[in-house]
Amino acid sequence: MFSRLRAVTTPCTLTCRRVHLKEKGKPLMLNPRTNKGMAFTLQERQMLGLQGLLPPKIETQDIQALRFHRNLKKMTSPLEKYIYIMGIQERNEKLFYRILQDDIESLMPIVYTPTVGLACCQYGHIFRRPKGLFISISDRGHVRSIVDNWPENHVKAVVVTDGERILGLGDLGVYGMGIPVGKLCLYTACAGIQPEKCLPVCIDVGTDNMALLKDPFYMGLYQKRDRSQLYDDLMDEFMKAITDRYGRNTLIQFEDFGNHNAFRFLRKYQQKYCTFNDDIQGTAAVALSGLLAAQRVINKPVSEHKILFLGAGEAALGIANLIVLSMVESGLSEEEAQRKIWMFDKSGLLVKGRTASIDSNQEPYAHAAPESIPATFEDAVNKLKPSVIIGVAGAGPLFTHGVIKAMASINERPIIFALSNPTAQAECTAEDAYTLTEGRCLFASGSPFEPVKLQDGRVFTPGQGNNAYIFPGVALAVILCEARHISDTVFLEAAKALTTQLTDAELAQGRLYPSLANIQEVSANIAIKLAEYLYANKMAFRYPEPEDKARYVRERIWRSNYVSLLPDVYDWPESSLTPPQITEEKLPH
C-alpha cells in the first residue's frame, strides 16, 4: 500500500525537511498539519509532551492507511464515504494525502466529482469544520483584513468560486465551497503541491436558489445574488488583496462561476494576474487531448473534423477556442477553423439571425443557417453530419439512441464525448455508446463509467476526460516557474503533453486518456513539459533558470510520508571537542 508517487519521483529534498515546532503536547495532535495519530515515535512522544496522551502502541503510516481502507469498505453511501475521508483531512493531513495518492483512481470520484456535488448540496447539513476563506459582499472595503486572517504566509495557489454554477447543479451559493476544497485536494494528491500553499475561497454575493434562501440551515447570506457594480468591485478588491499579501505570481484559479462572469473575468484578469478558469481552459485542454489521442487511432487530424457541440456555454466555448488554436497551428486560418465547429443549445442550432440571443463569445460559431434549420439535436447530427459530437450541456441524456445510431451510420469511427458532470447529467452512458456503435466509437466521459463488455466478448474501458489530468500539472509548472500570466497556449501545450503519455495498449482498450492510477506521474510530466515551454517562451520569472527542468520539478514535489518533528540532533567529531593536554609548569614563587 505504498504511494505510487514515491515510485515515480526522486527523493523530495526541498519540501520535506524536518518540521521545527514551537508548540508541544496536545496542540500537536489537534493540528492536522502536525498530527501523526498513533505514529508519533517514542522520542517524539517523550520530547514533545505527548507521552501518556496516546496508547503505548507506535504505528506505521501503512497500518493507519490499512485501517482507513478497511473502515471505508464497510460504508455503502458515497456521501458517508466523503464525510469519512474529509474527516481524515481535518485530523491528519499527511495520512489523508497518503491514502488518496495510494488509491487515487477509486477515491477521486468520492473526494471530487461526482460525489462532491452531492456533498455541496448537503453542505449545511454535513458541516464539521470550516475550510478556506469566506468573503461576502458585506465585507467590501475590508477584504484585505480578511485575507490577513488566513494563518499561512506562503500561499501560492488560490481556487475561488462564487457558487453560481456548481457542476451541473446550478446556484448553490456558499455551499459551493466544497468545489475549491476538493480541487485543491487534487492539486496536492495529483501534483504534489504543498497543502499549506493552497487556499480555497468562496465569494458570497447571495444566491438565486430559493430553496436555499428558505433553508434554516443555509450558511450564506440570505439575499438574492447581487449582480451590480458592487460585485465587480468586490472581485477587484479580492484579486488585489490576494496578490498584495502573497505576490503578483500567486496562481488564482476561477471555478464554477456563471457563464457570463467566467468569460468576463478571464478577459479582465488574464493579462493582469496569474489566473485561469478551469471550466473554460482546463476542460478545453482535456477535450483537445482526447481528440489528439483519437487522431492516433483513426489517423485523422483534428483540423479535418467537423465538430458539433451540445451546449454553447463556457465549457463548449472554451473547448472550441482551443480546438481553433490547434487547427490554426496546423495551418488553417482562424475563420476556416471556426467554420468547422457548430453548436446546439437549449434554443436550438447556433446560427446567425436566430430569435434567441447570441452573446459576443458565441458569435464566431454562429454560422449561416442551413436551408432547413434542425429542430432537435438528432436532426442537427443528420443535417450537419459531424465526425465528432461533444456534450457539455449538463442537461442529462440528450445523446439519445437515435443520435448515437446516426453518428454510427455517418462515420466509420464516430467520436462521442459525453463530458457533463455529475454522472446523472451525462449525455449518454458508455454502455450505450459502445453497444449502439458496435464498439466502433471513440468515447470519453466527464464522469467515471465501468468497462463495457459487448456480446462478442470485446471489452472497452471508457476514458474519463477528467480535468484533473490538466490543472494540477499546469498549476505545478506555473508555481515552480513563477509565471505571471497564463496564456491559452499553455493549455494547448498541456493537451499535447497529456496525449503523449497515452500508451498503445491503453488505446487498444478504448482509452483516450492514461489511467488515473498514474495521475501523479502524468502531472509531473506535464509540469516538466510546461516548465520547458514557459522558459523557452520567456514566460517564467524564477531565476536562475534550472538547467535540468525534470530534476527541478521532481525535487519539489511534496510527499505525504511523515517527517520528524524533533530538532536536528547530531554529533560533532570527538577530536574537535578535545582540548590539548595542559602541562604543569613551574609557577613563579
Curated annotation (Swiss-Prot):
Subject to allosteric activation by fumarate. This is NAD-dependent malic enzyme, mitochondrial. The lineage of its organism: Eukaryota, Metazoa, Chordata, Craniata, Vertebrata. One of its GO terms (molecular function) is metal ion binding. Fumarate binds at residues 67, 91. This isoenzyme can also use NADP(+) but is more effective with NAD(+). The active site is at residues 112, 183. The gene is Me2. GO terms for biological process: pyruvate metabolic process; regulation of NADP metabolic process. Residues 1-18 form a transit peptide. The keyword Disulfide bond does not apply. It comes from Mus musculus (Mouse).
